Swiss-Prot record:
It holds the Pfam family KH_dom-like. Residues 352-436 form the KH-like domain. CDD domains: EngA1 (cd01894), EngA2 (cd01895). Residues 4-167, 175-351 form the EngA-type G domain. Keywords: GTP-binding, Nucleotide-binding, Repeat, Ribosome biogenesis. SUPFAM superfamilies: P-loop containing nucleoside triphosphate hydrolases. The lineage of its organism: Bacteria, Bacillati, Bacillota, Bacilli, Lactobacillales. GO terms for biological process: ribosome biogenesis. GTPase that plays an essential role in the late steps of ribosome biogenesis. GTP 2 binds at residues 181-188, 229-233, 294-297. This is GTPase Der. One of its GO terms (molecular function) is ribosome binding. It comes from the Bacteria.
Amino acid sequence: MVLPTVAIVGRPNVGKSTLFNRIAGERISIVEDVEGVTRDRIYATGEWLNRQFSLIDTGGIDDVDAPFMEQIKHQAQIAMEEADVIVFVVSGKEGVTDADEYVSKILYRTNTPVILAVNKVDNPEMRNDIYDFYSLGLGDPYPVSSVHGIGTGDVLDAIVENLPVEEAEENDDIIRFSLIGRPNVGKSSLINAILGEDRVIASPVAGTTRDAIDTHFTDADGQEFTMIDTAGMRKSGKIYENTEKYSVMRAMRAIDRSDVVLMVINAEEGIREYDKRIAGFAHEAGKGMIIVVNKWDTLDKDNHTVAKWEADIRDQFQFLTYAPIIFVSALTKQRLNKLPDLIKRISESQNKRIPSAVLNDVIMDAIAINPTPTDKGKRLKIFYATQVSVKPPTFVVFVNEEELMHFSYLRFLENQIRAAFTFEGTPIHLIARKRK
């Protein structure tokens, strides 16, 4: 399901991040603590009155060295381009400032609903001061104390009221994938090369994100795919569209909409911190993953080049041991014909279901190899396991005490399940739960 987007904008020190965390609440989830996964809290999922939405803190996108007014103009532009609802945060302690008026004039021109949140209204006496904010021309101001959680429910009510109508569920038979990576790694060239393959029949379709054009194609076997438009690559972009932080946000939106994510690395430049950050988002979102090294034709190679690259990738992306690596060239079309079949196999892994009886045989065999651990004289006891969902495959292991299930033993069980059932290109999640 594609989630609508809510963007938070405002000048520095008005409490955007605090409000962001308050709205997102516990839904900013960290699936596991894995070295090498760099997290960024500019993007999360919020939920209110049974409506989910993607939440963006545009302040986290800025270049802190940029001029002050340029930063807030940048935020407003991103919000107007990306969001279905904009939350404009101002400070009740400071009153209306020149910067607030500057942003309001930009936002006034948009057709996107704007909710004016007056933050730092920490006591009832301050509520009388919020009326000055009517001068911004953005409708009723909502008094909020994000530190204390006061008034955030009213803001959330307004957000949900202004969200677009929920879209129908998409066809599960269609495999949705996206190409993500730093600017200038060759994503656009790869897209054009893939769509130029003789084996595919492509047609553009209107995307569900703002102004996006996704591409639908069918391979020679009749499998339907939708290539998610990433970062507006297929439309003319703004100057700021090629900044890395901005492309992080766009990539995360594409990840949300994808079943399988192709992480594209430039062979000429190698692996960068950005690559690990984006791959971490896809991993934590439970998406299928392929690591695509593009521009392979530009390297001088010997018999050890592939092995060296694979070793470096496995070292840099230790949390992606399950992801296949493929070396391609958009220019020469080297190995591009292998991508559709690889995407299909990973989609099958994402949707694979294991019968409980077969799964528990593997669990019992694993315990025989490596007995369950003890803590303070008490031994972990595993009663049974069952698969509860797909995309990604998720298993619940019922135990006597959740606290006795150490992360390392859970990882051992995961490895045993992988050895038995493969699960190519997809993370799998194991959850320990106390049997009632």
